[in-house]
Amino acid sequence: MDYLKWRGDLTFSQDAFNEVDNLLLSFVAYVNLEGLSVGAGEERVALEELSRRFFVLHSEEELAADKSFTRLAPYIVKMMAQSNRYRTSLISNYVNMVNPQLELQFSAVQLDLMDGSKNFCFRGTDDNIVAWKEDFNLGLGEVPAQKLASEYLNRFGVGTSPIRVSGHSKGGNLAVYAAAACKIEVQERITDVYSNDGPGFVHEFVTSDSYKKIQNRIHRYIPDSSIIGMLLENPVEPQVIKSTAKGILQHDAMSWQIEGPHFVSASLSESAISLHETLRNWLENIDENARTQFVDDLFSILESTGVDTLTQVQEGGLKNAAAMLRELHQIVPGTWSELENLLKAVLPFSGFLIMGRQKTVDRQNIPRAVTSHRAIHTSNKNHNENKVKQEEKRK
């Protein structure tokens, strides 16, 4: 990463914590730290030593098998561990909980930087379908991971040090939620909250007193064609970042452009604005049961492929598209428009699904008389063709 190559030699006493540092800490949260003795109540380990342990425990072949967009996180941490800026940072209190039955995925880690701060980083969404469903369930009220995030911050945020809270994707949502819901003695020491393309919240939360107490400490960053970061309500004005990727692939923060210690600014695309407005207007006019049904419908389509990740859905191409089309036919027509908008944003081959669904609808809407006429016409055509073939054989 260019930032570490050009500025990694600068300690925090030489150059203060900035927005790019926040994003780097979010990458640390994506690394699997199981078995490295940095769990809750275990050691505090310097990042340099942590990285060494990680690459002893995990082979290059194992890491190469990871096809998710977070696959580069261990290598980013390795670069951080080799820099003056981060190598002596202390890592601790790593937790990781996954329960598909409860649609729960929660992970967090603490980093103590040499500027005297405690930094709590929440893992976001990789491209696992279960994790993405939890993202969308955020629109239905509190999810288990949010409650765990506030409990985590209360447990490990004790002391006198200044606190930063951050995360990418769902991790950004958890960072904001935890900062708003934590104990007042912890909340008073929070200097900054960072949400990197994190989804928003239900209306009741963003209008609550607890949210308003930390609202002016929230920094929100989204790429120029953001999808996840535009979900639900988020009163904080975002800084829009130029990305080298397209569509949902912009959610990969490795595509975000950086210049010095800052992100490169851009304007929000029309597609991002349109999708946000469409979903917002629709969600405002339906009840909680309809919202739940919408989320279930969307993910029943994705899960019909039989794979675990969005990467695998895309790699399956038309085979997976066919499975999804069959599932789409089972969906109540009232949600088709909104489902199609999301599928178009997420999957490159979704046009096939929408065309296939529309052709089916068109066939279903053909009047019986027209269908009968077509059947008679086809029968007569086949009869005439057979008659010609018989004449040719006689000759």
What are these regions (language model features)?
Residues 1-118, 122-139, 143-162, 183-381, ...:
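Alpha/beta hydrolase fold serine-hydrolase catalytic domain that processes acyl esters and thioesters
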Residues 167-171, 175:
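Gly/Ala-rich beta-loop-alpha elbow adjacent to hydrolase catalytic centers
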Residues 175-184:
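Short glycine-enriched nucleophile-adjacent loop
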